[in-house]
């Protein structure tokens, strides 16, 4: 953990530079690239891999057809420590969202449930609540649990692990040629945020980095809203309205934008200049991990149809700006923007201005540094 600030609010006078926070999050052990792990095995056997590990859902071609399987695994131990039901339901929501943003249709769920000693009432309650969250989310999305396993008695003299349901989701993409990828695609594309931030920094990577416990707990999950946003992104993909799609999860909106920039242009990187409206605190808008949010891009020609489609699904939607350049520049706008200047009647503050090259360096080397593998 870093030095604890007086508050989790990102206020310039408290010395919290959003760009530095973003680099710290990208390089943190929980958000950095997993390449040091997955490069140790061959994940491209039989040459069917369309999208490999490390950048959202994995995509495997089904030979002899136009179809592909799409798979994602997710877990949210930090939120599970606050609320086991929410931790499990969020994990299902994120895994299905990661499948949906490729354009694929989620088909089924598997799980690995990791808990402490169930003979202790507290641990048994955690297990019951997590299973309830898993069931509620699966019913909301109409998905069967095809199998799974349970690991109990995960304790040491220091105590039990936090409730950790690991969720896997598999889906089907009817035409692999329509695959939507997470990286920004081309200069001039319009960046659109679908969904909105809600209060709560508990369990977030930002709170962990700041070394401070969030008193307000994690943000809530509306399963109906989650189902609607996934239906929207699948329809947008089917109508060829998207040039990229990335979900907002660990690290919040700022990390989602940084990942899209880092992975942009086929991995070469592609920046953007954006303006984010602030309805809550800057910390919540940039680094809060409210679910049911997706960053999508479209050509300028298709952007109006994309925004209209989101509204037809009764989803909040806002155009943030456009793709281009070699820097990620994010301004905050609105009454909640701190350190802001007046511009045409609204408050505007520069929040993030970082080279894409620096974003990539933080993300690619963070896990190796954390594990002490830099010299390998």
Model-found features: residue ranges?
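Glycine/proline-enriched, intrinsically flexible loops and inter-domain linkers
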Residues: 1-376
């Amino acid at each position: 953990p870093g030095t604890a600030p007086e508050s989790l609010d990102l206020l310039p006078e408290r010395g919290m530079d959003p760009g530095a926070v973003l680099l710290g999050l990208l390089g943190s052990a929980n958000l950095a690239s997993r390449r040091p792990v997955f490069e140790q095995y061959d994940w491209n056997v039989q040459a069917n891999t369309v999208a490999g590990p490390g950048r959202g859902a994995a995509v495997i071609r089904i030979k002899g057809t136009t179809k592909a399987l799409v798979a994602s695994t997710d877990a949210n131990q930090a939120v599970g420590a606050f609320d086991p039901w929410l931790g499990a339901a969020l994990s299902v929501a994120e895994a299905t969202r990661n499948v949906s943003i490729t354009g694929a249709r989620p088909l089924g769920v598997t799980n690995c449930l990791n808990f402490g000693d169930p003979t202790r009432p507290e641990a048994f309650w955690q297990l019951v609540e997590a299973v309830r969250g898993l069931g509620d989310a699966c019913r909301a999305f109409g998905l069967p649990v095809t199998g799974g396993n349970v690991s109990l008695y995960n304790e040491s003299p220091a105590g039990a692990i936090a409730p950790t349901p690991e969720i896997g989701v598999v889906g089907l993409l009817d035409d692999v040629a329509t695959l939507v990828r997470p990286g920004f695609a081309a200069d001039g594309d319009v960046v659109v945020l679908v969904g909105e931030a809600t209060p709560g920094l508990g369990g977030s990577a930002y709170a962990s980095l700041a070394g401070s416990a969030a008193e307000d707990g994690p943000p809530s999950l509306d399963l109906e809203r989650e189902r609607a946003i996934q239906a929207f992104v699948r329809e947008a993909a089917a109508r060829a309205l998207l040039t990229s799609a990335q979900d907002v999860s660990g690290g919040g909106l700022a990390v989602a934008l940084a990942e899209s920039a880092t992975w942009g242009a086929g991995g070469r990187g592609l920046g953007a200049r954006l303006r984010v409206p602030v309805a809550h605190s800057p910390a919540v808008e940039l680094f809060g991990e409210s679910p049911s949010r997706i960053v999508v891009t479209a050509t300028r020609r298709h952007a109006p149809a994309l925004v209209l489609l989101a509204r037809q699904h009764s989803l909040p939607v806002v155009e943030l700006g456009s793709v281009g350049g070699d820097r990620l520049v994010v301004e905050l706008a609105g009454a909640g923007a701190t350190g802001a200047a007046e511009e045409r009647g609204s408050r505007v503050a520069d929040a993030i201005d970082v080279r894409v090259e620096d974003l990539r360096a933080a993300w690619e080397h963070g896990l190796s540094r954390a594990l002490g593998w830099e010299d390998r």
